[in-house]
Amino acid sequence: MKSKNPSHTHIIRRLVQFGFALFILVTAARHGLGGEEAGVASTDALCPFGGLETLWRLVVNGRYIPKTHASNVVLGVGLLVGTVLAGGAFCGWICPFGGLQDLLTALRRRLRVPELRVPDKADRILGYGRYLVLAGILYATVSTAKLWFASFDPYRTIFSLSWLFEFNWATSWPAYTISLAIIVGSFFVPRLWCRYLCPLGGTLSLLSRISLFRIRRDTSTCIDCKKCDKACPVRIKVSDKRSVTADCIGCLQCIETCPVPDTLYVGTIVESAHAAESKEGVA
């Protein structure tokens, strides 16, 4: 029986999440206190989704959408390449907003508040929301040549610390309202934003389908205990799959929870169905 103590992988992931969140918050605080005059860029320049938003305008006429920079494009393209290699690991290891939602889930469990379970059918339907949000944002951004989503983005609202340095309810109430709703909702529904609304998550889920590395399940040793399903923060039915791709955030919690050694493992896209079962040639 596995220990209930956090694994080394779990601890490392939490430290990485905390480190990136701290970096963003410190950058936001320095910018809020000194501004660009002090040589500190805003958190807008550190957002990879900004690179995707401005990419069309940059390709068409060589200009950036206001508030985006070359750094956004570099981060955005780098993230896309990284996703083709490692799937949605950015969401599970790096994204500060994902880390915040994990923190809310941990708090809920500590307080012994029951999770609000979304029925499977509703979960599948709501999952398409990310793609609708993504399409709407890209259309509005291309049409207006403005960072249209910035006025509503809960990640930007929270981690830019605008509510601390530039609080203005009259002009920013939509962003504050959405952010509060997402925080409250994520307390009861694990990774609510990631699963149903995040446009960047929607983009990465599409690319994750062709990722080089992904979690695989050895069907010959699986005992169908479904502990992996319960452990998954985005509620993927891992026990029904031989290869986990699209919605996986790469947190590895399913592997850590599995009671049968090597039944769940990190494999590659080039493995054949036989290799997935026999585990011959696993990297």
What are these regions (language model features)?
Residues 1-231, 235-239, 246-247, 253-283:
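Non-ligating segments of multi-cofactor redox enzymes
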